[in-house]
Amino acid sequence: MELGLTGLRVMVSAGAAGIGLAIARAFVREGARVSVCDVDAAALAALAQSDASLHAAACDVSQRDEVVHWFEGALAHLGGLDCLINNAGIAGPTGKVDAIDPEAWDRCIAVDLTGPFNCVRLAVPALRASTNASIVNVSSLAGRLGFALRTPYAAAKWGVIGLMRSLAVELGPDNIRVNALLPGIVAGERQHRVLTAKAQARGVSFEDVEKSAFAGTSIKQYVTAEQLADYVVFLASRRAATISGQALSVCGDTNMLS
């Protein structure tokens, strides 16, 4: 399928590894011009070595001054903006709500919810000048379902859905599409860390927690970063011209998180 993304100007937060890197590379393959940010200096350096076409900057999206610096450099490099991918996020603490450190709560909300806001408020003026403008927020299935022992993360990801739906209504008259992607159980190091922490919190084995995680899922296999990237590039294309305000689950039909 020809998506017509040649020359599209894209910014991807947390784009130096994992899902963000898969998204950035998918856009590059489609001929887009891409800027990424990340907090991982080593991953950024490795990315710069492997792909000179990508513009990269160190940035913690919870820090407004760092976001401003990223946007100034990216917009100058790209010459404008057509698509913002709010991908940055952290897993937050795992544990019973009465045992969660309030500072860990604050940090999770700051990165996972305030971070997308910090990026959106700077992106919108540039997106208004685009003829194919879109925003994709990477939320989570935890933004649709309750998630025991992951209260901060779930609260933030529900907030990302609310942000997306409100922006879709507000920015629709400017022809800016806004959608959210809700990944289920994603393969990778981060998911392994989350399941390990949950096993420790419950006093059970990793294998037991992994089995429990898939108990409410019809298709019992991990979602891959590459599958998610395919959805994102489609949503950024003109083939998705009338898709906005949608929370799209990529989860193997998961109906319960545990």
Predicted regions and their residues:
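Short C-terminal tail/terminal secondary-structure segment
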Residues: 1-2, 91-94, 145, 221, ...
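The beta1-alpha1 cofactor-binding region of Rossmann-like NAD(H)/NADP(H)-dependent oxidoreductases
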Residues: 41, 57-69, 102
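Substrate-binding pocket helix/loop in short-chain dehydrogenase/reductase
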Residues: 95-97, 101-109, 213
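Active-site helix of classical SDR
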Residues: 120, 156, 164
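Residue(s) in the substrate-gating loop at a strand-loop-helix junction
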Residues: 140
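Short, small/polar-rich loop/turn modules that mediate ligand/substrate recognition or access, typified
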Residues: 172, 177, 243-245
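C-terminal helical subdomain
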Residues: 180, 204-243, 250-252
